[in-house]
Amino acid sequence: MDGSKAKKVAAKKFGGPRKKSVTKSIKAGLQFPVGRIGRYLKKGRYAQRVGSGAPVYLAAVLEYLAAEVLELAGNAAKDNKKTRIVPRHLLLAIRNDQELGRLLSGVTIAHGGVIPNINPVLLPKKAAEKAEKAGAAPKSPKKTTKSPKKA
């Protein structure tokens, strides 16, 4: 009984039981760490002073971009019948999206490969066009015999 009284006295003395801390990320409804981004902004010396809303805004923008890229990469993985996102899927997602492609145009993704592209001039003609041309004219002109070289 004396132990419970001591706890009550201690609770009154120090302001009650400690409340669970609420982070800035939780207050903003974000997954990205607002406090850490704020610390990086201050430590990086991008400006003399950093406003209280700047890290929240930057965290929200980064979270949105990450969600957008991951959604498109997940779709690319699904199109390739894979369950794991690999750098190739990230590259396909970014390069096939016009806005993300422009934003990340100078970025090289390791193990991403290249976008498949064949110049239309190099593609074979359609079968219908071949049949029409074959009936109208020979495929190649007849070769003429060369005159023998003089020694």
UniProtKB/Swiss-Prot annotation:
Record GO terms (molecular function): DNA binding; protein heterodimerization activity; structural constituent of chromatin
Positions with biased composition (Basic residues): 140-151
Cited CDD domains: HFD_H2A
Modified residues (N-acetylmethionine): M1
Annotated segments matching region Disordered: 1-22, 129-151
An annotated GO BP: heterochromatin formation
Short sequence motif SPKK motif 1: positions: 140-143
Pfam families per record: Histone (PF00125), Histone_H2A_C (PF16211)
Residue span of motif SPKK motif 2: 147-150
UniProt entry keywords in alphabetical sequence: Acetylation, Chromosome, DNA-binding, Nucleosome core, Nucleus, Phosphoprotein
A Gene Ontology cellular-component term: nucleus
Compartmental location: Nucleus; Chromosome
Post-translational modification comment from the UniProt entry: Phosphorylated within its C-terminal part, probably at the SPKK motifs.
Known function: Core component of nucleosome. Nucleosomes wrap and compact DNA into chromatin, limiting DNA accessibility to the cellular machineries which require DNA as a template. Histones thereby play a central role in transcription regulation, DNA repair, DNA replication and chromosomal stability. DNA accessibility is regulated via a complex set of post-translational modifications of histones, also called histone code, and nucleosome remodeling.
Subunit structure: The nucleosome is a histone octamer containing two molecules each of H2A, H2B, H3 and H4 assembled in one H3-H4 heterotetramer and two H2A-H2B heterodimers. The octamer wraps approximately 147 bp of DNA.
Entry similarity comment: Belongs to the histone H2A family.
Name by which UniProt lists this protein: Histone H2A.2.1
Source species of the chain: Triticum aestivum
